[in-house]
Amino acid sequence: IIILLIMILAVGAVFFKRYGSSNEEADKEQYYGIENSDDLALIINNEVVKKEESSAESSSDSSTDSVIPGKVFDGQYYVAYQVLRDKINSRFYWDANERVLLYTLPDGNVSVSENSSEYTAVNETKSEDYVILKTDGDIAYIALPFIQEYTNMEYSVEQEPNRAIITSKWGEIETAEVKKDTQVRYLGGVKSPILTEVKKSDKVTVLEDEDDWMKVATADGYVGYIKTKFLKNQKKEKTSRDFTEPVYSDMTEDHSINMAWHNVTNAAANNAVQQVLASTSGLTTIAPTWFSLADTEGNISSIADADYVNYAHTAGLEVWAVFRDFHGG
């Protein structure tokens, strides 16, 4: 009997080892790609952003091999410019030569210098109670609350490890409620390491349905897998945020545009407009190169000519003047 009992226990142990659930916990710093104590993990629109992803998308204009997506400086949370541009708000522009961050509004620019809590919004100087723009070499890091001021986004911050959960895409999502206390695992399968525990009635966002397992995102920034049988009340929801997007004016035409460039290098060259147009047909627009930078102070030189415009209009053409940025202009 004893031998039989031992055999049953041995078989049970082998069976559990093969099919039982693992209690191994995932290395959270490795999961988020955290290498240093001041790194900030970023979860943007239910995606964990890691160094390799941010550097791959920014390799064309960055002198670094890799970019840490987020940082913590003096208790404030910052996002790398490359990540901001690619994944949150592409209207921000970091000028690494001038060391200034720019954002264009319909009525003017917002500009921030590095290591400054002050910024210029159109023609007004404003300030925050934190440094807005930090730098690490040529990599710019922008404070999250400043980004939010000009972006339709929400964010929350969690510790252990430091991470920011950012939502900048709004619309329809799928949610579910947790039936009972269980685990979210790194991959679908009981042997996969545990990322976090979820409690009964917790709400998760459903990202993918993989039959026995669901890929979900938790409110505190974990993206992993949970057994389908532990979820209930799956439903579609609309998400939105009260934010007024800036309206940028533009011009439209009610016809196709057939445009020709006219390389005008000096004032006398304007006199050739009649000859130039005589050799064309079907044009709607002519674009003479009339303007250029005159000096390093930003002054502009012009060789625009009223007679040129009048002749073009008589010929039924619109004139779109061009700012020359070549041939020393």
Each predicted region: which residue ranges?
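Primary recognition of N-terminal secretory signal peptides and signal-anchoring hydrophobic helices
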Residues: 1-210, 232, 239-252
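Short, solvent-exposed loop/turn elements at domain surfaces
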Residues: 51, 184-187, 215, 266-273, ...
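Extracytoplasmic/secreted envelope proteins and their assembly/folding machinery
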Residues: 81-85, 144, 148, 270-273, ...
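SH3/SH3-like beta-barrel fold
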Residues: 103, 201, 213-218, 226
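A short macromolecule-binding patch
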Residues: 179, 220-231
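Chitinase-like catalytic core of GlcNAc-active glycosidases
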Residues: 254-263, 267, 277-280, 292-329
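Conserved, mostly hydrophobic/aromatic
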Residues: 286
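Conserved residues at the C-terminal ends of beta-strands
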Residues: 289
